[in-house]
UniProtKB/Swiss-Prot annotation:
Homodimer. It comes from the Bacteria. GO terms for molecular function: ATP binding; metal ion binding; methionine-tRNA ligase activity; tRNA binding. This is Methionine--tRNA ligase. It is found in: Cytoplasm. SUPFAM superfamilies: Anticodon-binding domain of a subclass of class I aminoacyl-tRNA synthetases (SSF47323), Methionyl-tRNA synthetase (MetRS), Zn-domain (SSF57770), Nucleic acid-binding proteins (SSF50249), Nucleotidylyl transferase (SSF52374). It catalyses: tRNA(Met) + L-methionine + ATP = L-methionyl-tRNA(Met) + AMP + diphosphate. Its EC number is 6.1.1.10. Keywords: Aminoacyl-tRNA synthetase, ATP-binding, Cytoplasm, Ligase, Metal-binding, Nucleotide-binding, Protein biosynthesis, RNA-binding, tRNA-binding, Zinc. Binds 1 zinc ion per subunit. Is required not only for elongation of protein synthesis but also for the initiation of all mRNA translation through initiator tRNA(fMet) aminoacylation.
Length: 720
């Protein structure tokens, strides 16, 4: 290898001069880690390892999210204190993260002294700056447990479709959303008692303050993901719309959390102290390691701060969190990276089908965690797209890529090198064109990882692995070994193969760190960094005896995994069913004592009169058309993206293409049926219906006209 070749490869690698703080969302200390959670932690860990391999100063911080009513109630149910519960769950979560190679520099807890102090400090700073408001609000109250009830702890009869045992904020049968006060025959999930209405003073973060809007409009321009930027702009609205609402940051006792300074019996809502937990975990690490915490978090700091999250919590991390930091005297995040959800075999994870797979069950079944790391990485990119774990594809891809292509290279060459050449490579082979091609590809692969385009990085790597295998197939070392006269050619072939394998291992190291560690031991080399692309194997360092690096996925392992999750969750499901049945029975008894349930039954012809109860079943909402496009392959349909006042938009296909161009509709308000059952169409899932008017005889009087409300109507408003 020439000096100029070495110089060019070294120059392509970024110098390790950045200081970077990275977090993943905090898992709630109320349950097990499952493979859906692992998507995020594996994604973050790959990125962190990529940066470390450049030599940057990187801290990967995590913690359990430990506060809130669910923690308090679960602890009570199990006969534990909340502290005992969260300590046990912390141990389980830490075990699972370690099993999957998630390399936190510190994994802590939000129930810590550091978090209490920082949460209070941020709150007081916001209060002093005029961002805290006090208001009396009315809430549901459990008279038996003497506690205010979150929406999800109230059940009753859906006011729209009259389905029983529905939550206090939405119906799982018809999809309607509503206020807890609209629920019919409500009961407390905690005690079964009928809730009463009670007022209480609450504390709000004034997100509606014009200073917040001005700051957030500027901050959002720096987000890396267009989907996140667009979502933020939807939430912010146009200048002057004042769409941001104040955020209730307090909860009443009894509550497991931190008491608000100067407000006895009032506690910080979990979503205030949870993100502060990022800083608390980091401060705990800094104090132990002599790192200047303040230098990392003060305004104007030259350090970088990144948050990896699921797209379902984008709202908290791109509105509340940066605004809290900005106006409490802290630096704001450099960027927030959101990912999509995980499906298994094309469907939502299911306990009944065994696809609600826990991290521990995966390990207990004997599956290699680096198989899952590789599979997720092959599916992940820089967008918020959902990814699917197809179990057949998982087995095929691991067996083909990792065993058939990658590991196979070392196993085909190592034996010959040890037996014939004392395990020492041929130095001249390090200049082979194939080796040079792999070496030159390393900076691009590293760049793909840093851009969070893991799928691209792995596709490039496996394309190179194909070329190496083609080289070995063409050289046929097994035939060369038969004739001593071919010793030089055999030595070169084995040396090229193993140096190529080293470079492929370097390319795969962020994804498969344990395999990379085994490869480093096999070659007798220091831990691989990106700059080591320019440091080939040497005859001065003999390789060790080859140890098998990876086995194939056995279909029986997948079957055992699904069975294990069905079996382990059966008792839980049975217990939950009994509890639900008892609660429902209590609710029915309470309902009979307090009210007569109404059930609407529609009979008769289409033009028969209907009752007001029948009409009330239809959930009509104001919707804003935030995007519109023609549907390829259809001459009738337009695809609408609708803001209906929820945290996420709705996708609706509408047969109005004959009347409107897509650009005519963007920005308009219309009326939609929000509780229509989603319909799977050829072009995708339609999540509702927009309303349009037309003549009875459309041939004689053609035309379609979407309904538009008067000015002043806002997305999410109900049409009554």
């Amino acid at each position: 290898m020439s000096a100029s070749d070495l110089t060019s490869v070294q120059a392509a690698a970024p110098q390790g001069d950045r200081q970077i703080l990275v977090t993943s969302a905090l898992p709630y200390a109320n349950g097990q880690i499952h493979i859906g959670h692992l998507v995020e932690y594996i994604q973050t860990d790959i990125w962190v390892r990529t940066l470390r391999m450049h030599g940057h100063e990187v801290y990967y911080i995590g913690a359990d999210d430990t506060h809130g009513t669910p923690i308090m109630l679960r602890a009570e149910k199990e006969g534990l204190t909340p502290k005992q519960l969260i300590d046990r769950v912390w141990t389980e979560h830490k075990r699972d993260f370690d099993s999957f190679g998630v390399s936190f520099d510190n994994f802590y807890s939000t129930d810590s002294d550091e978090n209490r102090v920082l949460s209070e400090k941020i709150y007081v700073a916001l209060q002093d700056a005029g961002f805290i408001a006090e208001r009396e609000i009315e809430q549901a109250y459990d008279p038996v447990k003497e506690m205010f009830l979150p929406d999800r702890f109230i059940k009753g009869e859906c006011p729209k479709c009259h389905a029983k045992d529905q939550y206090g904020d939405n119906c799982e049968v018809c999809g309607s959303t509503y206020l807890p006060t609209e629920l019919l025959n409500p009961y407390s999930v905690v005690s079964g008692a009928t809730p009463v209405r009670k007022t209480s003073k609450h504390y709000f973060f004034r997100l509606s303050d014009p200073r917040c809007e001005t700051f957030l409009r500027e901050w959002v321009s720096g987000l890396a993901q267009p989907e996140a930027t667009n979502k933020m702009r939807e939430w912010l609205g146009d200048a002057g719309e004042a769409k941001l609402a104040d955020w209730d940051i307090s909860r009443d006792a009894p509550y497991f959390g931190f008491e608000i300074p100067g407000a006895p019996g009032k506690y910080f809502y979990v979503w205030l102290d949870a993100p502060v937990g990022y800083y608390a975990s980091f401060k705990n690490l800094c104090d132990r390691n002599g790192v200047d915490f303040d230098a990392w978090v003060r305004p104007g700091s030259t350090t970088e701060q990144y948050h990896f999250i699921g797209k379902d919590i984008l709202y908290f991390h791109t509105l509340f969190w940066p605004a809290m930091l900005e106006f409490s005297g802290h630096r704001t995040p450099t960027n927030v990276f959101a990912h999509g959800f995980l499906t298994v075999d094309g469907a939502k994870m299911s306990k009944s089908r065994g696809t609600f797979i826990t991290a521990q069950s995966y390990i207990d079944t004997g599956l290699n965690p680096e198989w899952l790391r590789y599979y997720f990485a092959a599916k992940l990119n820089a967008t918020m797209e959902d990814i699917d774990l197809n179990l057949d594809d998982f087995q095929a891809r691991v067996n083909s890529d990792l065993v058939g292509k990658y590991v196979n290279i070392a196993s085909r060459a190592a034996g010959f090198l040890i037996k014939r050449f004392d395990g020492r490579v041929q130095d001249s082979a390090m200049n082979h064109p194939l080796v040079a091609k792999l070496r030159e590809a390393i900076p691009q692969i590293a760049a793909h990882y840093e851009a969070r385009e893991y799928g691209r990085a792995l596709r490039h790597t496996m394309e190179l692995a194909d070329e190496v295998n083609a080289y070995v197939d063409g050289a046929k070392p097994w035939d060369l070994a038969k004739d001593p006269a071919n010793a030089v050619a055999l030595h070169e072939t084995c040396s090229v193969s193993l140096e190529s394998f080293r470079l492929l291992s370097l390319a795969l190291k962020p994804v498969m760190p344990r395999v990379a560690e085994a490869v480093e031991s096999f070659f007798g080399i220091a831990p691989l960094a990106w700059s080591d692309a320019a440091k080939p194997l040497s005859s001065e360092q003999p390789i060790k005896a080859y140890q098998h690096l990876m086995t194939r996925v056995d279909p029986k392992q997948i079957e055992a995994l699904l069975a294990a999750n069905r079996d382990s969750l059966q008792a839980e499901a049975t217990g939950a069913a009994v509890a639900t049945a008892n609660a429902a029975k209590d609710a029915k008894n309470s309902a009979k004592a307090n009210a007569n349930a109404k059930q609407a039954v529609v009979n008769g012809a289409d033009d028969a009169p209907i009752s007001i109860d029948d009409f009330a079943k239809i959930d009509l909402r104001i919707a804003k058309i935030v995007a519109c496009q023609a549907v390829e392959g259809s001459d009738k349909l337009l695809q609408l993206t609708l803001d209906v006042g929820e945290e996420k938009t709705r996708n609706v296909f509408s047969g109005i293409k004959s009347a409107y161009q897509p650009e005519q509709l963007v920005g308009k308000l219309t009326v939609m049926v929000a509780n229509l059952a989603p319909r799977k169409m050829k072009f995708g899932l339609s999540e509702g219906m927009v309303l349009a008017a037309s003549a009875t005889d459309e041939k004689a009087e053609p035309g379609l006209y979407i309904l538009e409300p008067h000015s002043g109507a806002k997305p999410g408003m109900r049409v009554k």
